[in-house]
Amino acid sequence: STYQVVTGAGNAGLALLEQPFNVIPHIPEEETKMEAETRKIMGRLSRGKVRPADFSVVASCARVWVRDGHLESVVVTVDEEPTLDEVVEAFSAFRSEIDGRDLHTAPKEPVHLFTEDARPQPALDAYLGEAEGLPGMTAGIGQVKVTEDGRIRFFVLSNNTIRGSAGGSVLNAELALAERVIGP
């Protein structure tokens, strides 16, 4: 389930600002798009085409009256039941493919793992990465749990306008330039 800020709706979202403290449990076409895009992102490139990952994604999307940051509740089913320590270690040890590439908009900490309760929160954590001078480029993960039936459950927060849009686009361009996919 995603809880997407009103600014994520562009100009149409501005009308929602007139309905403060509200949650709208439907974003037209967003659930279908999210299900398909997740499988594409997690898929493989084969013969110049993306082959979507072979697993199901079930999404629910709500628009929330928050200034910045999309919050997502994620439940993952895995083949072998992990321990909570293994999941926490995997998140803590995560390193991006762009680590060490000296890209100006790449945060040193692409993912921040919260161990305290009730985090991440858009009001408190939408600008993670501020210490590095890259506010909003770090995603936050928290409330990590392994359920009784072995599923991994957590919340993830990312800044929709900085990491998800403008900053993410600049970072992609920097990477494309570094990889010589595009020229100066």
What are these regions (language model features)?
Residues N22, N159-N160, N172:
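Asparagine-centered polar/low-complexity signal
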Residues E29-T32, G164-V170:
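A glycine-rich, Thr/Ser-enriched phosphate-binding loop motif common to dinucleotide/cofactor-binding enzymes
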Residues A62-V66, S158-R163:
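Glycine-rich phosphate/pyrophosphate-binding beta-alpha loops
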Residues E81, V146, N159-I162, L177:
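Short, glycine-/Ser/Thr-/acidic-enriched flexible segments
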Residues G167-P184:
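Amphipathic terminal alpha-helices
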